[in-house]
């Protein structure tokens, strides 16, 4: 789903709906963020996982020798991969809460995406959104944010943790504070994207990464 706002430097945010319910509460929360971004002049695209089966990463390393493309050829991964390669200015990932964590299919997609394309996502503002019936939201929120904080991506905050509550589709709209949090997130992301695009200093210098373990 693509949403068009008033274009400003062709800035765009990709939103990934990690729920198997394409039009459920996670989609509704992400749509609130997207509408706010559009009102701020930022174009948006929402890609939904839906009920598609998603292969997990097997650490084969082929993406490092294959032009940053995963060895598994599923349509969903390449749809997200192509959106990132075509150029985005920000990323929002949304998920329902299952057993205190994000949807497993979403994590499988993100594992592959960030392993193969972390350099393309570097310094892009990012945020996660979680929706739950009752509990586990903060644990799922923390899990998703780890992808961003390991990839040199600035986290966009809101007035509260980016979570909303609802069980049946559309019920999340009754969470007034949750919906306001989504709108604040959209405005804050638009602000950060503009500031980064208008900046004169450029990005920080990166050191060559060092990989160690607890043995050496």
For the regions a language model picked out, list residue spans one by one.
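N-terminal beta-loop-helix "entrance" segment that forms/cooperates
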Residues: 49-69, 168-171
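Glycine-rich phosphate/pyrophosphate-binding loop and the adjoining helix
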Residues: 39, 154-216
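Short, Lys/Arg-enriched N-terminal segments with co-localized hydrophobic residues
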Residues: 1-10
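N-terminal beta1-alpha1 ligand-phosphate binding loop
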Residues: 12-40
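Helix-loop-strand module that forms the ligand-binding subsite of alpha/beta enzymes
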Residues: 65-160
């Amino acid at each position: 789903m693509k949403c068009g706002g008033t274009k400003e430097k062709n800035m765009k945010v990709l939103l990934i709906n990690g729920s198997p319910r394409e039009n459920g509460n996670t989609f509704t929360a992400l749509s609130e963020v997207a509408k706010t971004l559009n009102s701020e002049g930022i174009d948006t695209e929402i890609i939904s996982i839906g009920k598609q089966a998603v292969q997990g990463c097997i650490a084969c390393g082929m993406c490092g020798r294959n032009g940053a493309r995963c060895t598994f050829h599923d349509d969903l991964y390449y749809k997200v991969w192509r959106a990132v390669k075509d150029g985005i200015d920000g990323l929002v990932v949304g998920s329902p809460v299952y057993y205190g964590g994000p949807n497993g299919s979403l994590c499988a997609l993100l594992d592959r995406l960030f392993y193969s394309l972390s350099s393309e996502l570097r310094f892009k503002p990012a945020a996660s959104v979680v929706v739950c019936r009752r509990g586990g939201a903060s644990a799922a929120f923390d899990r998703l944010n780890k992808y961003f904080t390991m990839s040199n991506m600035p986290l966009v905050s809101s007035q509260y943790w980016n979570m909303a509550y609802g069980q049946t589709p559309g019920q999340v709209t009754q969470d007034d504070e949750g919906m306001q949090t989504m709108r604040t997130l959209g405005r804050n992301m638009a602000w950060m994207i503009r500031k980064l695009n208008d900046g004169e200093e450029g990005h920080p210098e990166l050191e060559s990464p060092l990989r160690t373990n607890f043995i050496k």
